[in-house]
Amino acid sequence: IKGVAGLSVPFTPWSENSMLAVMTSIYQDRFFYIKYFQQPEVPEQEAEADVGITLRKIYYSLSGNSPADDWLKPKALDDGLLDHLVDPEPFPDWLSVQNLAVYINAFESGGFTGPFNRYRAVGIDHTDFSGYRNVKLSMPVCFIGGEADSIDNYVPGVDGYAKPAVGCDDFRGSTLIPGIVV
């Protein structure tokens, strides 16, 4: 590997506590999407009930057009993924009706289990990568994020972009693009 560019999510070195354990602790009394995705079948049933509304709400909520932190706004522990997310009308012009239809068709054909399984595997990732504790990225690394990315606020009160060079021996710089989501 000659170099790495992190997009939206800065590199996080392995730690004793898994990301799932940390987020479960932080969000113990309220909804957090990664915790929600750990349930078998429940997220799929919600998302697949109306794929168009699901994608519109998720894409908008994670975009720079939505109110700040819309994706992470406090929700009750028993809320669903789509509860309290806005389905904007009209939808912002950065995603045409024709392009959205392509994604809708793909998810109607393939479902959401595969994408949700990526989040269900975070505990497995933590175990599998335990051999990499104290290992740093030695190749050139840069980071690019958007000022409107929700990742910056995943841990309340912590700037998720404050230390993008952690775990990198050859960090070349960080760029935050104003007003957008990367």
Where are these regions (language model features)?
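Flexible "cap/lid" subdomain of the alpha/beta-hydrolase fold that forms the substrate-access gate
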Residues: 2-172
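Short glycine-rich catalytic loops that host catalytic nucleophiles or stabilize transition states
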Residues: 169-182
